[in-house]
Amino acid sequence: PSLALSLNTTNEILIEKELENIPDLKSSQIDLLKTLLLISRHWDPSLKTQPLQDEIKKLVLDVKHNLKDSNDTTSITHALRMAIHNNAGYRYTEQVDSRGYPTNNEELFLHGMLETKRGYCMNLSLLYLIIGQKLDIPLFGVPLPNHFFVRYDKGKDQINIEATEMGTSFPDSFYGQRYLGSSEKDNLYFLKNLNTKQTLGAYFSNIGMVYYQNQKVERAIFYLKLSTKINPSSIDTQNN
């Protein structure tokens, strides 16, 4: 037991060192899948990540198969929806609290969603973004108060993807009316494209909240500090 405890402590230190480097990296240097699996192992040191990586590989291959060399916006977004929701069966979890966060802590993490195929706005969006990074598709995370969605953005071609609604597309005006109060509409953070690093910053805020709710205050502070360092203009981070 003491050896296992020592190994866990060593792994924890190594994971935290790697995560602490993220604010200093360029987005192009960050592997989103690898980082999200690190965060999952930080939560559950016994986690086996190979089956999770295999699941992502299957999704990536399915998107490639659905695309068949098409590169127009409609074909790309359709291929993503088909692979993630229709074929693999990923859905919005029905067990959520008043803010829309899963009551099952595991479903706040990538591993929990990949195992149950149920997630919430943030990690369902992250699934799109992982595939986007693997296939060089211009996808971006888009933040709102208590919500997060995906935007395909290639110059003049732009389409929003609502991961909690089977990949349905809604205009920016829909999100503005639904999620932004009058004082938030001029905020420079909301409804803007986030790069990979900024997206992780938004996710770190949510992870900090999970640890805080589980009375792990030091770990909560660790993630919230990272979040604030990456996204200082995010109100959500400051509120948490």
Language model regions located:
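A structural boundary/capping signal
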Residues: L3-N240
